[in-house]
Each structure stands twice: as C-alpha cells, then as structure tokens.
A protein has these predicted regions:
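Adenosine-phosphate binding glycine-rich loop
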Residues: 226-313
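NAD(P)-binding Rossmann-fold cofactor-contacting core
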Residues: 148-174
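Rossmann-like adenosine-cofactor binding region
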Residues: 174-261
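Glycine-rich Rossmann-fold phosphate-binding loop(s) that bind the pyrophosphate
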Residues: 134-135
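N-terminal ligand-binding/catalytic initiation module
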Residues: 1-107, 115, 125, 269, ...
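Conserved beta-strand elements of the Class I
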Residues: 128-130, 289
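Short helix-loop-beta connector
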Residues: 121-128, 211-212
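N-terminal Rossmann-fold NAD(P) dinucleotide-binding loop
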Residues: 138-139
Length: 313
C-alpha cells in the first residue's frame, strides 16, 4: 500500500489539476452516503471537538473513507485544530491502495472546491481577494483562486492580528502582493472575492459591507452552531452550495433561515449542477454571489484518486 505523508500528499495535489479532477467527478458523480459527525465531549460535558467520517466510492474503480478531527482548542496548545487520515481502496476487491494525510487532503481539496465555484460565480475580472482567517486552509486560498481568476492583490484579516500578519508574510515570500488588515468592514467593501475559512460561531462578515459584484466564499462552518456571515449576507446574495448537505448542516444558512432571510428554495444550484451546465452561474457583474461549502466525500475521493494516480505514474 502506498503511504503518502503530508508533504507527499501536498506535492501530488497541485491546484490546477485538482480543480480539473474535482470538476470531472462532479460531472460523473459517485456514491456518497451521509457523513457522520460526532461531538466528542470533555469530562465536564462540554464539547472538546468533532470527529467526521466521510466515505465515498465509484463502482468498479476506487472507494475511500476519511476520518477527520476538528478540535478548535488545540491552537491554544500550539497544535493544529485539524487532523485526519484518508484510506483509498480498490472498489472491486477492497484491497487497500493508499493512505494519505487527511488534513492536507482536506485543506487542498477545500480551497480547490472554492476556486472551482469561483470559476462560475466570481466576476471574470476579479483581482482583489480578501482572506478571512489565517489557519491551515486560509494559507492556500490565494494559490487556488489564482488558478481561475487574475488575483493581483490579497488582503488578510484574522481575529488575532499576529496570525494575519504571519500569513501575509508567507504569501509575500511566494511573490504575492499581500498585506494584513485590521478593518474588516473596509476590506470587505474593497474586495472582489471574500473567502472565509474560520471556525467562528458568530458572524464575521456583515451583509451591509458587501458591494455589488462581490463573490462571498464561506468555507469554515460545518455545524448548525457555526457561522461566518450574518443573515443580511445571505439575504442579499444569490446562494449556491457544494451539495444539498449544506442546507442541513451549515449554520450560515440555517441561522439565516431562522431569521426569515433565507429558504432552501432560494438556492440557485449545487456545484455539481454548475459543472454539468444544469444551472447558470453569475448572471451579471452587479450580482452578489455566495458559495457555501461544508465538504463532501466526493471531493476527498477526487483528490485521493489524483494523488494515487500521480504516485503510480
């Protein structure tokens, strides 16, 4: 069985081919049973973190399952909040084919999915990117978005300014025009694409800040209690999702619905429908578009297949 650690997994998932692989699997489809999310309690009964189990398979090809842990309190101990492992098997025999670093796979396929969505939903001339958050996933947003839009300027905001400054510095080392910002409202108003990748449980981006033509990419929340944008963002936007699962699990949408600002019938399409040409993306330059992703095992399988095939070549 092939073993790919974090560095090897990253090397085998360059963003342009990964975006193409995701597009292809969204078009062809695969079997994706409901994922399981389990809250892991502390001894006092409060929630320490969550464990996610995400299987998917293509009959006659490969099957895979990812186990991911998300423990936000880890950052206070100098640890990553996200850990995971992915196992790829032969769907005909069940023979294990490869083990990949789940956190690296998750990070890269997540931002690649956002970039794939932006290829349909962001304005063609979108060049100003705002990254909200400074964690593992945020580190790769600019690279992925640059594959689909002419990103020329990146700004970074984080609830801890030091995190934003550190990420902006790393981006500058890679040749990106990047700066950390303190004023989130002003940064949102200046951006063409706003990409949020946090574990926030309260709204960070307010709808009144969004100017016409903005694309809002919401990556972080995956439970009903989490949200990165307020209800006004959802009310003003043409909403798209990575899958229908977002309607049941994304706090950004569920809490907006509770406020009367959103209903499931208002979703303009899923990413699969966009990729298959079944739904139109952005209609004009003045629309505000919103893409909410919660992740799916299809996305993991596409990345794992690409990494495994590349390692065999």
């Amino acid at each position: 069985m092939l073993i790919l650690d974090a560095e090897a997994t990253r090397a085998r998932l360059p963003f342009a081919p990964l975006i193409d692989a995701l597009r292809a699997l969204f078009v062809s489809g695969c079997d994706v049973p409901p994922r399981a999310v389990h809250a892991i309690p502390k001894p006092d009964g409060s929630v320490a973190g969550h464990v996610l189990l995400m299987p998917a398979w293509q009959p006659g090809a490969q099957l895979g399952v990812k186990v991911v842990s998300v423990f936000p309190g880890n950052t206070a101990q100098g640890l990553s909040s996200l850990h995971g492992v992915y196992l790829l098997l032969d769907a005909r025999t069940g023979v294990p084919l490869a083990q990949l670093d789940g956190a690296e796979l998750t990070s890269r396929r997540t931002v690649a999915v956002s970039a794939l969505a932006a290829s349909f939903l962001a304005r063609a001339d979108a060049s100003r990117l705002l990254i909200v958050g400074a964690g593992r996933i945020s580190a790769w947003v600019a690279d992925a978005m640059s594959c689909v839009r002419p990103i020329a300027r990146v700004r970074v905001w984080n609830h801890r300014a030091a995190g934003a400054q550190a990420l902006a510095a790393r981006l500058r080392e890679r040749g990106v025009d990047a700066l950390a910002v303190d004023d989130l409202a002003a940064a949102v108003a200046e951006a063409d694409i706003v990409s949020c990748a946090t574990l926030s449980s309260r709204p960070l981006v307010e709808g009144r800040w969004l100017r016409p033509g903005t694309h809002l990419d919401l990556v972080g929340s995956f439970t009903p209690e989490m949200r990165e944008a307020d209800s006004e963002c959802v009310r003003r936007a043409h909403v798209f999702v990575d899958s229908d699962e977002a309607l049941a699990k994304a706090g950004d949408l569920l809490q907006a619905a509770a406020d009367g600002a959103f209903a499931a019938a208002q979703v303009h399409g899923t990413l699969a429908q966009l990729c298959r040409g079944e739904r139109p993306g952005r209609g004009d330059a003045s629309e505000i578009t919103l893409f909410k992703s919660v992740g799916s095992a299809l996305q993991d399988l596409a990345g794992a297949q690409l990494a495994w095939q590349g390692a065999r070549a």
